[in-house]
Amino acid sequence: TPLAAREPPVAPLEVHQDEEEEEDEEQLPPLDEEPIREHFQPLTPITEKTEVTRRTDSTRSSDAVRTPTVARTPPAERRQRTVDERHAEGAETEPAPVVRPPPHGGLLRDPAELGLPSPCSPVDPDVLGALLRNLATPLSHTGCFLDRQSVGGQGLLQAVRKHACKTRARRSSVAGGAQPWALHVEDMCVGIHHMLGEGGYGAVFLAEDLDGHVPLALGQASTPVEEDDIDEEERRRMLALKVESPANIWEFYLLEQLQHRLDASLRSSVVGVRRFTAYADESLLMLEYGATGTLLDLVNQAAAAGVASAAPAPAPGAGGSSGLDEVLAMFFVVELLRLLEGLHRADVIHGDLKIDNCLIRYDPLREGEAWESNYAADGSGGWHSKGVKLIDFGRAIDLRCYPAHQTFLSDWAPGAQDCIEMREARPWTYQTDYFGLAGIAYCLLYGRYIEVTSSVGAEGQKQYRIQQPLRRYWQVPLWTRLFDTLLNPRLASAHGTLPITEELGAVRREMEEWLAANSFRAGKVCVAPVYGVADQQNLKGLLKKVEIWALRA
């Protein structure tokens, strides 16, 4: 039975102080609280209904992203410029007057002056409205932003839902499938193929740029396409169309910020924006389309792809699979560790890090480049082109927009996929991403959702660990350190402070060293039952099998 997605249980929200409990051992509710997972919904960048708070007019009006007030306090040390600078050059033909840069790194006022509660919900519409109004440069000045907030969307979400194909085609046969329904949006004509996923306030559809008017994402535009590369041209025509009502401006803002804050080597690991249209009551977010599926898809189909772990599969009715080969699982974990370090250095918390929000990434090699067999952590030898692409930033947090030491509290009903602090109604910051990554690593290894237990240490501090023992033939010290660090981040820090970026970097480097030494293991041969691919289980061979599986799925 494949892993199943489900709505988290609804529970009243109470705030408790962060204090240690005097108990010897406590088992927390596992991610598979329900005994049997009947069905797993395919990937969708839309979060569940309980994860989204409705936006108000404060984020949709024409003045939503500007304010005439200019703060008089000196700039904070940690603030950096946060606005889109792609259109910083003016079009004036005459010399323009000297304009001083915003005093707070792209913000009009010091966030401490906004009067935000701490803790607060990161999806509270009043909070998001205040943050957007405090931006020094309106988002409407961004090149891929179409500001139509003075008019309504005229029921676009309902219309697209009505005409989208009910049957989901194979990823490999989309281009030659049924004729899509044409949706005209401003100067663009977009063909709607079918729904990819649905949430409480919107849905995601597979769409196609029919007239070539949808701009490419920054990463796509920087990669040249050969004239005879028909497959790549078709892939570029495809896009993921996220339609929401009310309009969701915040996710667009975060995605645009990351394309300027992240190191160039990490930008391809975050889904790129192609065009965003904001109406008074709806929004259309056009994103890169990931045709190779998600890590969760791969876990559920690991045996068919020929990349499953040698461990026996779970008992019938238990849900899940046997997980991935350890080498392949560690490769994806390293990619996510590197990306998470980059996000946190950019002062961004993803807030909804889970395995079905991780697309498998296969980028084209550079001209004249060959993919080497031996793993290279620095991305050389073609290894930069393989990895993950993170999606769904609807709950993401830009810490540069908040006062220092800001904490957060969930106003949605937390589920077993959420971090311990959320489930215990305690304030949190980076913990949500750490627990999310632990859950992904666990699922890659075991083929099912994470289960954790807790115990009280010698100094009276509660410590969390995974419930399932690590298999003896795995790299037990490496995985133990990873899970201990992610599940107990304050204990991993020398001073009990967050984030623990350096500590995670140390774990990542150890894993990279092991991969470099063991990425070309000999002697173990596996034949994929569906595709008949026989290859030694080295890392490059495993990734080739994943690519073949993705193309034929």
Description of each model-found segment:
Residues T1-R133:
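Ser/Thr-rich, low-complexity intrinsically disordered regulatory regions
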Residues V98-H193:
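Juxta-kinase regulatory segment immediately upstream of eukaryotic protein kinase catalytic domains
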Residues H193, E198-Q257:
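ATP-binding glycine-rich loop module of kinase domains
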Residues S269-V327:
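Conserved structural core of kinase catalytic domains
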Residues F332-V333:
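Activation segment signature within eukaryotic-like protein kinase domains
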Residues L340-S385:
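Catalytic-loop of the protein kinase fold
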Residues G382, E424-W428, F435, G439, ...:
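Helical subdomain adjoining the active site within ATP-dependent kinase catalytic cores
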Residues K389-I397:
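Activation of the activation-loop gatekeeper triad in protein kinase-fold domains
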